[in-house]
A protein has these predicted regions:
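Core alpha/beta nucleotide-donor-binding catalytic domains of modification enzymes
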Residues: 2-120, 128-133, 138-141
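Class I SAM-dependent DNA methyltransferase catalytic core
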Residues: 2-6, 28, 150, 156, ...
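Exposed boundary/loop context
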Residues: 10-13, 17, 72-73, 83, ...
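Membrane-targeting and insertion segments and their boundary/processing signals
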Residues: 22, 80, 117, 121, ...
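Short glycine/proline-rich turn/loop motifs
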Residues: 84-89, 124, 300-307
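Conserved Class I SAM-dependent methyltransferase catalytic core
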Residues: 101-178, 182-185
Length: 332
């Protein structure tokens, strides 16, 4: 059990989504005093403000600056900057894509604080694993050089959500301390032998009564794959993934298997393009099940359409991963 309020910090949460970074930090017992967040998704912002009512909304990252924050000290900057430009599943245009250039907004804010004599001591950034290999590694090298030129000492690791939750989701995390920081403790690596969480199975909620499906739905037995950002307007994608366990035969109309040989199932995305098999019938996972697969409390995104809930959860960071990293940052 973490000691409550052992640390008190001011946080700037960029590309904040539904608050996965802030929730993970809060779960360690760290107290967030001044709390700022920035995102342009009005639906995600609605969820964020509901769950963190004392946080200050800043709007687009392009409006965030030392002056905008009135010179407020920031102890930790977090950001899962847009990953579509670097995603293996996307077009991988990188910095040619407008979304890819938003990293430079992070660098601008860091430099702004440095120039005003209040450098942000810690940064924690997240992106898809594909960032490492994009453009023959030049994209990652550029990001690394920009941050080190700003005098941040960096640590990086690809972390898999499956070490914490039954979802196979690999993400690159970049942690930096300004001027090397005052702590000699390394944040990375984290791994199976370093975490205090167990990959518990996620119970399927209730039963499905839609789309002709009836009956109680069984628990997931294995590990789901990645919740990712896709267009919800492609409902047919639910049939492009493997749907049946390898231990069972593909029935009439089936398209494959539900789980891999190692118990890992295939990809969930923001359109909920993942299914559960029951008596040779299929249904999508519910938003609550997706919340559990990302480590959020049940109902974290409720009050909005399922379309928005799937999108928000697919774009979110996995909460227990952030919690594990934060425990290393603050030596908890």
């Amino acid at each position: 059990m973490a000691k409550k309020n052992r640390k008190n910090i001011n946080i700037l949460d960029l590309f904040s989504g539904i608050g996965g970074f802030s929730l993970g930090i809060k779960n360690t017992g760290v107290k967030i005093n001044k709390h700022y967040f920035s995102d342009i998704d009005k639906y995600a912002n609605k969820t964020y403000k509901r769950r963190f009512p004392n946080a200050t909304e800043l709007g687009s990252i392009e409006n965030v600056s030392y002056k905008k924050l009135k010179g407020e000290k920031i102890d930790l900057l977090t950001g899962g900057f847009p990953c579509q430009a670097f995603s293996i599943a996307g077009k991988r245009r990188g910095f040619e894509d407008t979304r890819g250039t938003l990293f430079f907004e992070i660098a601008r804010i860091l430099e702004d604080y440095i120039k005003n004599g209040k450098p942000i001591p810690c940064i924690l950034l997240e992106n898809v694993k594909g960032l490492l290999s994009h453009d023959n590694k030049r994209t990652f090298i550029t990001i690394y050089k920009i941050l080190t030129d700003l005098n941040y000492t960096l640590e990086c690791q690809v972390v898999n959500t499956r070490w914490f939750l039954p979802q196979n989701r690999e993400r690159i995390f970049i942690f930096g301390r300004y001027n090397g920081g005052t702590s000699g403790r390394k944040v990375f690596p984290i791994g199976k032998n370093d975490i205090k969480f167990s990959s518990k199975k996620i119970n399927i909620v209730g039963h499905s009564g839609t789309g002709g499906q009836r009956g109680d739905i069984h628990s997931i037995d294995g590990i789901m794959s990645c919740l990712s950002a896709t267009d919800y307007k492609q409902p047919k994608q639910v049939l492009t993934h493997s749907l049946y366990p390898r231990s069972s035969k593909t029935g009439k109309g089936g398209t494959g298997h539900l789980t891999k040989e190692d118990g890992t199932a295939y990809c969930l995305d923001t359109g909920n393009a993942q299914a559960v098999e029951y008596n040779s019938s299929i249904r999508k996972l519910t938003p609550t099940e997706c919340e559990r697969l990302q480590g959020f409390p049940d109902g974290w995104t409720d009050g909005q359409s399922d379309t928005q809930r799937y999108k928000q959860l697919g774009n979110a960071v996995s909460v227990p991963v952030i919690e594990a990293i934060a425990r290393k940052i603050y030596d908890l």
